[in-house]
Amino acid sequence: MLSRLSERCTIATGLEQVLRHYVWSAAWLRDAEPAAAASENIDLSGLMERAGRAAYDVFANLYTSQKHWLILVGSGNNGGDGYVIARHAREAGKIVTVLRMPHSKPLPTEAASAQHAWKAVGGTESTMSPGAPLQLPADVDLIVDGLLGTGICGPPREQYADVIRHINGLPVPRVAIDIPSGLNAETGEAAGACVKADHTATFICLKPGLLTGQAKDYVGQLHYRSLGLEDWMTAPERMRVALCRRVALDDVYEYFGIRRSALAHKGSCGKAILVGGDHGFGGAALMSAEACVTVGAGLTRVLTRPEYAAPLLTRCPEAMVTAVETDTGEQLKQQMLEAFEWASTLAVGPGLGTGAYGQAALTAALRHAELHQDKTLVLDADALNLLAGCLHGREGGAAAGARKHLPVLPNSIITPHPGEAARLLDCRVADVEKDRLAAARRLAAILGGTCLLKGPGTIVHCHSSAKTAIVDAGNAGMASGGMGDVLTGLLAGLAAQRMHDTFDTTCAGALVHGVAADMVAAEDGRGTRGIRATELIHRVPLIVNASGPSPASRQRPSGQ
């Protein structure tokens, strides 16, 4: 079943298999390009030639019947790549129209060289007039975006923005060189007009802005080409400065390739306890329990309100249920502390509410986790809202008044969506989304553990190790109620089994969650609209028991 899912980042050779699982800063790459070129005994013009040729090959293979290519070139090296593409397209018999943005200073040396080579084969270009409407040949059937590269920060200037908006409105396929113009290569922010590409060809390394933030709306299918620099990029000194990992479909085999011992028993597979389901929110605890059981926890126990005990046991008889009746703060905390002694993993949040029940659960969980640092504590939903109250002294927080002391919990996992993240950081949602990687680092520091920042291009960051990952799985169908409850159950169940450290457990849980949603969307061409959270649960065993390449066959390069 996993083999039916399409890879989100295509590669040309097996040597690129490792590199598409790592991400470097675009700024680092710009500084490193001279050394990269020198390693191949070529100059930067030679490297541009490789990039343009690689992009041409990608686009020509995708669009074999398109006869008239429009190449839009800007004033930087992205435009230089466009000239190289134009030359190869012309040599292949395509009709090529090159439109150049006006610029007041000379082209960079490499771009000027590519422009000269284009003109040397008889190529021509037109310069767009400032303020004039964009005039395009009527028979153009492919638009190549070479306007702006990875150095853009902030919205494009108005003339660029006008062109971008115009081509986005045309019923013609659009492809982007390295990154869609207008998209921030470091953060994935589209601060203004941004090219909506059907395909993007990127070079040498993946950049974070292609994978998170608003990238999913603009990048289309991603194609990675290393330009023959695989050995140079995988050297330890380069791997050490990689910004983060890209966790993707084939990582399923790395996380779950080791089979469960034939001598396993329910005690050895971990005991997870889930706290949630206050009055009116029983479904959340139920979905979380089902996910925890299905991902392989040895024993699952749920603390919830009495009215949900029977429905939960009917739906998920494998789970144990403890009904919590009291609303007295100290009695609540004591009951929960006693229950927590049984568990190896705690998860607090699904349907928790922010009343006395929720406040007691969070207080007890933090106290217990501080005393039992070996246990994993997962916090989600209203547990995070209550935690924000502790941090910022808001009404409804587990501590009234000033900020409460919070323990350092290296084995904690918090799983905020952008709204919860904004409350935890006391900022706007827009501030979180502007730089999701930076937000995840700040969030992980709150308890000194691991943060999973939900959203397209989920970010996982571990405070103690400073490791970061972008999880490239999942789809828009996950924008529905209950998805976070399922994720909490998956994380609790995986943490209970202690297959990996907390960071890798979090990455694995996010990956299972996203891949399950992709499986649902792919079945019989169903699509993403109307996916229910419970549908993901039934796909989980297929993922965590998937057979594929052994982890030993996918060894990471030294330096990681």
Curated annotation (Swiss-Prot):
Q: Which cofactor does it need?
A: K(+)
- Catalyzed reaction equations: (6S)-NADHX + ADP = AMP + phosphate + NADH + H(+); (6S)-NADPHX + ADP = AMP + phosphate + NADPH + H(+); (6R)-NADHX = (6S)-NADHX; (6R)-NADPHX = (6S)-NADPHX
Provide the protein name: Bifunctional NAD(P)H-hydrate repair enzyme
Q: Write one Pfam family the protein is assigned to.
A: Carb_kinase
Superkingdom field: Eukaryota
Q: Where does (6S)-NADPHX 1 bind?
A: 160, 178
Q: Which NCBIfam families match?
A: yjeF_cterm, yjeF_nterm
